């Protein structure tokens, strides 16, 4: 704790992941407003990139990633969270566009087995990970027990890839009226633009109902 701010310093030794250093902080500006952030620096981080010729190149760099955000609680019990994320290891829009074009070509009828295998390897090498781009915006609003709905919390979440304009929109509702159990229903709706991160997902919309059980040992 320094200057009324919670600060953590982090270090990760080299292993399955590159050696990294970082820090995070959180500070309450008032009883309603909190700001937070994270920063990470990686050493000799590998990155597979698809060239325009169709070949794959492995490069190393020392990328920086960071997050800045704020949380605000209104007098009506609405919690707003807004965040900006920069992924230093992410792919540019031109790199992602080349990848999407290759994948779309590889899955067309008549493509060779070698091309399909290469497409699968690319998907596993980093292109298909969550937040594979460079810049993102996150917004979430949740309301605690609106209209006197006891144990109920509805929420809306938007995640946008700022560089290609695609987004994910997630309305959800949770209920905790049962002992040690939470029920959560969620819809995941994606933008439809082709050759964008969220537009290229396998499913354009998904609906899920989850049950979480909690057990406390005294």
Task: Spell out what each predicted region is.
Residues 1-3, 27, 72-74, 143-145, ...:
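Residue-level signature of outer-membrane beta-barrel architecture
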Residues 11-15, 41-45, 84-90, 143-147, ...:
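Transmembrane beta-strands of outer-membrane beta-barrel pores
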Residues 24-26, 38, 69-71, 140-142, ...:
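Outer-membrane beta-barrel architecture
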Residues 11, 51-57, 123-128, 157-159, ...:
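Extracellular loop and loop/strand-boundary signature of outer-membrane beta-barrel proteins
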Residues 11-21, 131-135, 158-170:
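Solvent-exposed loop/turn segments connecting transmembrane beta-strands
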Residues 137-141, 204-218:
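Outer-membrane beta-barrel "beta-signal"
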Residues 2-9, 32-36, 77-80, 147-154, ...:
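Repeated loop/turn-to-beta-strand initiation elements of outer-membrane beta-barrel proteins
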């Amino acid at each position: 704790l320094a200057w009324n701010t919670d600060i953590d310093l982090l270090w990760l030794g080299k292993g399955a992941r590159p050696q990294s250093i970082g820090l995070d902080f959180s500070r309450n500006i008032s009883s309603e407003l909190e700001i937070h952030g994270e920063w990470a620096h990686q050493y000799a981080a590998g990155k597979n990139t698809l060239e325009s010729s169709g070949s794959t190149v492995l490069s190393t760099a020392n990328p920086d990633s960071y997050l800045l955000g704020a949380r605000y609680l209104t007098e009506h019990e609405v919690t707003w969270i807004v965040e900006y994320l920069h992924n230093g290891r992410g792919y540019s829009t031109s790199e992602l566009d080349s990848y999407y074009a290759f994948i779309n070509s590889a899955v067309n009828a008549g493509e060779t087995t070698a091309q399909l295998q290469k497409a699968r390897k690319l998907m596993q090498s980093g292109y298909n990970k969550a937040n594979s781009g460079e810049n993102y915006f996150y917004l979430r609003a949740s309301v605690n027990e609106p209209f006197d709905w006891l144990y109920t919390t509805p929420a809306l979440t938007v995640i946008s890839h700022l560089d290609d304009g695609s987004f994910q929109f997630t309305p959800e509702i949770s209920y905790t009226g049962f002992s040690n159990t939470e029920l959560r229903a969620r819809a995941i709706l994606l933008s439809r633009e082709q050759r964008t991160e969220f537009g290229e997902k396998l499913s354009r919309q998904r609906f899920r109902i989850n049950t979480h059980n909690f057990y406390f040992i005294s």
